[in-house]
């Protein structure tokens, strides 16, 4: 057990059972780079404030740079019996530069230090998740382009609804993932505030130039209130919310393709490299990667819920409960990263069966188009809905669909059906009849795909 940074107050060594319970170094070692980065800036701020002389400031900076370089080259070196990553860095610094290293923590609390480290960490790591999101979105865009003018049914209540282009369905998932990308931008911006200068809770008694520190570390602003800063984990909760919603959307992707690659749908087929088999049943081709993505969504949601419950009962100011922010945050990041990789790999190799989807896109799901046809001939929509509903009921009883009707049979339901009804009531005509820019009209889908390509190209 390394000597604790706070040991001067106590006349006996910590009970290992109690001390070890509070040790966070095994997981907060991930903040090593951010902790050193923050300490380098803090040392410079202390020197500018006249708290450190030039010799000590130089020694501290040189020592921290050496520590950072070794940690990057030898990640396994970042270990030991320290209480946390802050203690590890300070111990290594003192070992290198002596008493100068003991001056580094002047005017600074670990309360603000850990907040700084987490903010720096999220600013550094969120763009990596966004890269993976873009790769997954690109996989959907590629599949949408390959799908061309293939048709499929859309679903509400998991019942066939209206014909759509397969590409429109694929781009619906890309649209949701783009919102996740934007939410991560917002989470990064929320974290982009400098907490240094807040001290343990009341601020620091040294003339620290926080504007300089913010600029040095690339922060957009300085926090407004030192008491709030010491206990603020809103930015961590916002990140977990963004991750949880991303995982919800990936879970929906997984659910769709678990269903649609099964024999009952057969719309798509998983590549052999995207599936596993059964140890007992030789015929099985199981969507294990998708099922794991779906399962891991609950894990991410749990991390968000757990942090919110941790935060909700705390009095104002720092409390040790907040140590429980890091493990869920790190695991949520890891979970989203591997889930995005797996999803992009599976989607990128999907095989479409356009004949199967086209057959499923015909039949009674053209009922809305039949009603719209009557509306175009002057019938009020509510009356058209009633007429077409009666037609559907009769066709179901006769085990037929609209395509089997002769013109005479059409006109038995309404004299408004004209010679063009059979060409107007097809799946292809249905998608061409959509008018709005967000619709499944081929031109709208082509424009949406082009816009996504442009967005991806901009990075």
Language model region names:
Residues 118-126, 130, 145, 153, ...:
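Charged, flexible cofactor/metal-binding loops and thiol motifs
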Residues 2-38, 92, 99-100, 266, ...:
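Glycine-rich cofactor/substrate-binding loops
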Residues 51-52, 219, 379, 400:
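Helix N-cap/coil-helix junction residues
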Residues 1-203, 208-212, 276-277, 292, ...:
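A helix-coil-helix interface module used to build multimeric assemblies
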Residues 25, 82-84, 94-95, 238, ...:
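A short linear-motif detector with a strong N-terminal bias
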């Amino acid at each position: 057990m390394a000597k604790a940074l706070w040991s001067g107050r106590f006349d006996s060594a910590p009970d290992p059972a109690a001390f070890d319970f509070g040790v966070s170094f095994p997981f907060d070692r991930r903040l090593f780079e951010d902790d050193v980065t923050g300490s380098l800036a803090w040392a410079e701020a202390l020197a500018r404030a006249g708290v450190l002389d030039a010799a000590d400031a130089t020694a501290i900076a040189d020592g921290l740079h050496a520590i950072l370089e070794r940690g990057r080259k030898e990640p396994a070196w970042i270990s030991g019996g320290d209480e946390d990553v802050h203690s590890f860095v300070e111990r290594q610094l003192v070992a290198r530069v002596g008493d100068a290293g003991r001056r580094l923590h002047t005017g600074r609390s670990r309360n603000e230090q850990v907040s700084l480290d987490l903010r720096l960490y999220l600013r550094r790591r969120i763009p990596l998740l966004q890269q993976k999101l873009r790769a997954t979105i690109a996989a959907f865009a590629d599949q949408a382009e390959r799908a061309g003018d293939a048709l499929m049914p859309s679903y509400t209540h998991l019942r066939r609804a209206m014909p759509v282009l397969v590409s429109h369905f694929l781009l619906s998932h890309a649209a949701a993932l783009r919102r996740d990308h934007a939410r991560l931008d917002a989470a990064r911006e929320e974290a982009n505030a400098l907490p240094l200068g807040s001290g343990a809770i009341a601020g620091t008694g040294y003339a620290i130039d926080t504007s300089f520190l913010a600029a040095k570390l690339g922060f957009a602003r300085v926090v407004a209130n030192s008491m709030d800063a010491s206990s603020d984990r809103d930015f961590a909760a916002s990140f977990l919310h963004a991750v949880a919603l991303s995982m919800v959307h990936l879970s929906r992707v997984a659910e769709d393709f678990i269903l649609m690659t099964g024999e009952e749908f057969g719309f798509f087929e998983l590549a052999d490299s995207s599936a596993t088999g059964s140890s007992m049943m030789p015929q099985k081709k199981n969507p294990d990667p998708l099922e794991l993505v779906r399962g891991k969504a609950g894990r991410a949601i749990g991390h968000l819920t757990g942090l919110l419950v941790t935060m909700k009962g705390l009095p104002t100011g720092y409390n040790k409960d907040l140590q429980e922010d890091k493990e869920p945050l790190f695991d949520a990041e890891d979970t989203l990263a591997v889930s995005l990789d797996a999803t992009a790999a599976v989607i990128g190799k999907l095989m479409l069966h356009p004949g199967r989807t086209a057959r499923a896109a015909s039949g009674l799901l053209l009922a809305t188009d039949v009603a719209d046809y009557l509306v175009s001939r002057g019938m009020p929509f509510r009356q058209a809905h009633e007429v077409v509903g009666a037609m559907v009921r009769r066709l179901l009883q006769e085990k037929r669909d609209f395509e089997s009707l002769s013109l005479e049979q059409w006109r038995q339901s309404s004299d408004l059906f004209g010679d063009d009804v059979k060409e107007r009531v097809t799946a292809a005509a249905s998608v061409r009849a959509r008018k709005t820019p967000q619709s499944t009209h081929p031109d709208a889908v082509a424009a949406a795909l082009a816009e996504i390509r442009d967005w991806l190209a901009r990075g």
